[in-house]
UniProtKB/Swiss-Prot annotation:
Sorted UniProt keywords: Acetylation, Cell membrane, Disulfide bond, Glycoprotein, Hydrolase, Lysosome, Membrane, Protease, Secreted, Signal, Thiol protease, Zymogen
Function: Thiol protease which is believed to participate in intracellular degradation and turnover of proteins. Cleaves matrix extracellular phosphoglycoprotein MEPE. Involved in the solubilization of cross-linked TG/thyroglobulin in the thyroid follicle lumen. Has also been implicated in tumor invasion and metastasis.
Post-translational modification N6-acetyllysine, affected residues: 220
Subunit structure: Dimer of a heavy chain and a light chain cross-linked by a disulfide bond. Interacts with SRPX2. Directly interacts with SHKBP1.
Disulfide bond entries: 93-122, 105-150, 141-207, 142-146, 179-211, 187-198
GO molecular function, one term: endopeptidase activity
GO cellular component: apical plasma membrane; external side of plasma membrane; extracellular space; lysosome; melanosome; peptidase inhibitor complex; perinuclear region of cytoplasm
One Gene Ontology biological process: epithelial cell differentiation
Record InterPro entries: Papain-like_cys_pep_sf, Pept_asp_AS, Pept_cys_AS, Pept_his_AS, Peptidase_C1A, Peptidase_C1A_C, Propeptide_C1A
Family the entry assigns: Belongs to the peptidase C1 family.
Protein name, per record: Cathepsin B
Domain of life: Eukaryota
Amino acid sequence: MWQLLATLSCLLVLTSARSSLHFPPLSDEMVNYVNKQNTTWKAGHNFYNVDLSYVKKLCGAILGGPKLPQRDAFAADMVLPDSFDAREQWPNCPTIKEIRDQGSCGSCWAFGAVEAISDRICIHSKGRVNVEVSAEDMLTCCGSECGDGCNGGFPSGAWNFWTKKGLVSGGLYDSHVGCRPYSIPPCEHHVNGSRPPCTGEGDTPKCSKICEPGYSPSYKDDKHFGCSSYSVSSNEKEIMAEIYKNGPVEGAFSVYSDFLLYKSGVYQHVSGEMMGGHAIRILGWGVENDTPYWLVGNSWNTDWGDKGFFKILRGQDHCGIESEIVAGMPCAHQH
């Protein structure tokens, strides 16, 4: 099924590129065009010497995939603030502030999940359990239930995997933090940087059920389990209530080429071709110059966007941002 969806999303990208009269992606012309529109956000360059195949590969969320059961509505009884930032609400949970880097791999579906899961384990243990959950374990061991690894996957499958098989700890590339740190290096977005070049190539690493040398406990004993996984309705208030009560969530949306140029403000699509689906972590909301927004963490390193974060228009299901919200709860007995 996912092969069909992946093919369809590729076709979408191709047809939209053919029919587009827009400026070349990542071009100065596109930056200038967006900034002349006087919209709610500012454009600039985040990627300099990268191949477009790499950028398309980053968009590895297969939209409209399998759905998790929807949780019961509870927002009606809640008084929600005008703005909310999980980083400030739970300051003793450092993963909420963290931005990771998925490298040359379409693993955003895994990153959005493990980032929000890490946050929630800390939040629901009242700060007692601080763990970077392993994107490597999710990416390499989930298998076909999650899609196709670096070639794209389903956020819903990721949360389901957490409840069924659990996830070990694992930090950033070369961090030697946790049982299974990420094995794909960050690649170079800039002209004269020191990281390897960004390409659209890259196979999914193998599933290894062994922790890296010197780490204990064992792989089996390092697993953190979810006790539930669910989707949240596309109702704006329900999504806000979920984040307010339980912590950051994973979402996914359609990326157009103008989004790649985001620097600050509240993103809304202005111009450019559809690149694919992208999964992210939503950690709050607010209003900027009368424009309501979601506060979102990306997985394209801290030199992208606003130190790795961005804001996107809230309340209008813009680019589908409110249609694919998934989350879950950690098992209390682990704490």
